């Protein structure tokens, strides 16, 4: 039997996000988030779904951590809800919010599970959106203040931190496409958000160095594997643009090299703040690791009539329930590419997974062989990247639980644990048992 063994100490994890699983968004003195107001506005989310209940993790957190323990998973990546901690975004700290996350952190540590905390996974306090949110330069100060509260309260026990989850999605899907909160469609606002996200990230890293002496901090990006529709120069250039704009370079180029990538500047210089370069020296704060999220690949071509002159070409490939093409070698490509381009000291796959139309069978189980196949193929490609020298230190499945999939509501299931939303019953899917075995063996059996 051929076993693909991972390095000793490799961290196998599962991931979630606050608004997607917690429910009870206003409980115990929490403030409103932009996802609360956005999802409560008719037409924004499929079927009118909201995160009011979600997986009720706010009340069932203990049961959910017991599932992680039972599966033998070694790390749990979760996010903290900014408005639970600072209901107005700044100023008054809500002790009951701190208490909730303290219970989670302490329980994880008791069970030998390493917490990876995401400081911001999209649920901005609505009070700050009223002041302009990510488009307001002051948000770097607000974010630094919020981060300091987290580091001072949790930094004694939490040693692995992520400043931002997928800042491209925050800026572009939230402020240009209008599909995510706050639901804006303004390219100038979107690129100001890109810039302010970088400034906020750097400020948080700076505060981290002052407050947590023995931890690591990084940032997480969404990535696609873009391939050209032909060998034509214009299609190859379209791929380069998509990589620089859509993937990690949009943010890592400023962090490592002090400017936005070349093709992004060509496209977006006029949308960025006039004197954006004045901020670049502070943006270049050193980070300890890069987190990459990867789900899918895309065939792209030059299209003179499309925004940014790029459009997607559909391929006859297997797809997930999201309609995303399954291209496992993309995870290998993105890992190799980040090493080649920026050579970060450590890399994590902070999300990888798939939505399928899962059903509970008559035997009470969820037989999601398609998800097992997806995970196995991607983990195998990640293993290959390690063999070729990529400093990959861990892998997190998205997600532990089926949950509120943003604008798709509850219609898309990503979990390795099934959630029956009418009863909140949890059922470990076949993929959950399979993944448990991968963790136990620290590798894949062919």
Curated annotation (Swiss-Prot):
Annotated catalysed reactions: Hydrolysis of terminal, non-reducing beta-D-glucosyl residues with release of beta-D-glucose
Keyword check for Transferase: no
EC number: 3.2.1.21
Molecular function per GO: beta-glucosidase activity
SUPFAM superfamilies: (Trans)glycosidases
GO biological process, one term: cellulose catabolic process
Pathway: Glycan metabolism; cellulose degradation
Location of the active site: 166 (proton donor), 351 (nucleophile)
Coiled-coil ranges from the UniProt annotation: none
Keyword Hydrolase in record: yes
Key words of the record: Carbohydrate metabolism, Cellulose degradation, Glycosidase, Hydrolase, Polysaccharide degradation
Parts of the chain that traverse the membrane: none
Entry's family note: Belongs to the glycosyl hydrolase 1 family.
Name used for this protein in its record: Beta-glucosidase A
């Amino acid at each position: 039997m051929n076993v693909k063994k991972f390095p000793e100490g490799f961290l196998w994890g599962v991931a979630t996000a606050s608004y997607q699983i917690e429910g009870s968004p206003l409980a115990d003195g929490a403030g409103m988030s932009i996802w609360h107001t956005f999802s409560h506005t008719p037409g924004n989310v499929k079927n009118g779904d909201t995160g009011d209940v979600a997986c009720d993790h706010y009340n069932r957190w203990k049961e959910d951590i017991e599932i992680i323990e039972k599966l033998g998973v070694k790390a749990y990546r979760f996010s903290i809800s900014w408005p639970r901690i600072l209901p107005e975004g700044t100023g008054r700290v809500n002790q009951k919010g701190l208490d909730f996350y303290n219970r989670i952190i302490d329980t994880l540590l008791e069970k030998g599970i390493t917490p990876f905390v995401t400081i911001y996974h999209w649920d901005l306090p609505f009070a700050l959106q009223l002041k302009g949110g990510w488009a307001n330069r002051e948000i770097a100060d607000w974010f630094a203040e919020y981060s300091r509260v987290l580091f001072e309260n949790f930094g004694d026990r939490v040693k692995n931190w992520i400043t931002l989850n997928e800042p491209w999605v925050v800026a572009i899907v939230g402020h240009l496409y209008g599909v995510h909160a706050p639901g804006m469609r303004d390219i100038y606002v979107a690129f100001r958000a890109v810039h302010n996200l970088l400034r906020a990230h750097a400020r948080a890293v700076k505060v981290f160095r002052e407050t947590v002496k023995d931890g690591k901090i990084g940032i997480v990006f969404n990535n696609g594997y873009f391939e050209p529709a032909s060998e034509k120069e214009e299609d190859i250039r379209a791929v380069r643009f998509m990589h620089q704009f859509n993937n990690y370079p949009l943010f890592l180029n400023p962090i490592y090299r002090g400017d936005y990538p070349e093709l992004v500047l060509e496209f977006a210089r006029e949308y960025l703040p006039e004197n954006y370069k004045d901020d670049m020296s502070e943006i270049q704060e050193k980070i300890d690791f890069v987190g990459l999220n990867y789900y899918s690949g895309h065939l792209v071509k030059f299209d003179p009539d499309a925004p940014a002159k790029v459009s997607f070409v559909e391929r006859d490939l297997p797809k997930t329930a999201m309609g995303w093409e399954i291209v496992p070698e993309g995870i290998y490509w993105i890992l190799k590419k980040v090493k080649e381009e920026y050579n970060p000291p450590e890399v994590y796959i902070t999300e990888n997974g798939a939505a399928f139309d899962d059903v509970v069978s008559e035997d009470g189980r969820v037989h999601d062989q398609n998800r097992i196949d997806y995970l196995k193929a991607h983990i195998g490609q990640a293993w290959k990247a390690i063999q070729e020298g990529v400093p990959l230190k861990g892998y997190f499945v998205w997600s532990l639980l089926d949950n509120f999939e943003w604008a798709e509501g509850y219609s898309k299931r990503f979990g390795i644990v099934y959630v029956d939303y009418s009863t909140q019953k949890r059922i470990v899917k076949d993929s959950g048992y399979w993944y448990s075995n991968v963790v136990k063996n620290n590798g894949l059996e062919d």
